[in-house]
Amino acid sequence: MKSLEIEEKINKIKWCRRSNSSHFLLSTNDKTIKLWKVFDKSLKVVAENNLSNELTPSGPVGGGGVPRPPPRSSFKDPSLLKLPRMTHHDTVVAAVPRRTYANAHAYHINSISVNSDGETFISSDDLRVNLWNLNIQDQSFNIVDIKPANMEELTEVITAAEFHPTSCNWFMYASSKGTIKLADMRQRALCDEHSKRMPPLWYECVYDDGFFFNPLIVFEQEEDASSRSFFSEIISSISDVRFSNDGRYIVSRDYLTVKVWDVNMERQPVKTIPIHEHLRPRLCDTYENDSIFDKFEVVFSGDAENVMTGSYNNNFMIYPTDQEKDTEIVLQADKSAFKAKKVGVPTPMNRGANGKKNGSRSTSPVGPGSRMKKETDADQIDFNKKILHMSWHPYEDSIAIAATNNVWPLPPSHLYLHLIVVRGNIN
């Protein structure tokens, strides 16, 4: 047997829904999931004690004063003694682990997602998805298992999984083949019939919540056979998948594109946004430096009118989900973003001779703290500076970006001017 050291890192963090004044979150590394309680901890110091009246005029102890020996008669009477008095000094954020969920995954965990019922969550690795109860740490249920009897027959792995934001029975998981599978736990205990090449069940079910649902929905866009290459399977692998807050839309990210799907139309995405189309001729280079395996996240805005994802050179982009709009905002996570006094104007993506968007941008005014033109020359791209992780506030236009070793929070006042241009409220 070999002892394998588990790297000290956090793969995913998810907030639990609040049921009281306490805050809880789930975190996971490659093998272990933990539930944390997060709270404000009050730090107190001694403000008054028995020596408080026996100090030099220069100040109390700890503030520069030097205590002098008390008179011999100071504490002869017990009534003169008093308990130390504590006062509030500072408030810090503290976290304590409440539960540990371990020994359920044979492969590295890539996703966790908390259910809308506030009681359960799922975790996924390369081949399985497990269902947990937040209150039970030593037992889980396997709801997806795509491991073949012979591992040589393995053709895909699970890359991400997420619960539906409002219906506690639905969840989806994405694969390295570029497919998204939407499953309903009310159908059966193991929700992977399509993964095991079972015959499809062409029927719809109606439930009390009013949803019509085919339990075997697979979202997949057929690939053009003429454009298939050695890298096709790698670049089609989905690195992240999210529901919109209302559960109507799904957004997915692969290496070259972002796709927006309607849950009622699985045959093709309602919008495909080119992200790294300028890197297609340089896929050999990205393969050699392993950049082609970078896992970029994608997020919806709270109203689902925009999506945001990251790129290289510490750039991140915001796009409208409306099919009729092709405007793009490119921003860069650097210190100048917080010194900006004016905002650049986003420009539409250029179209090639065939009328399709080619992912390049026309020149546009650039305000301090913004980059309205994404670098399209692969030789000028710094592949070590990349935006992989991000978050968008569910109720306001505030975002948080992780760039190298820094977190960049952008408040509504900075983001608002960019978004109103995308939403078409100003010319």
State what each model feature region is.
Residues 30, 115, 126-128, 155, ...:
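Sequence/structural signature of beta-propeller domains
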Residues 14-22, 112-118, 161-168, 241-247, ...:
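Loop/turn segments within WD40 beta-propeller blades
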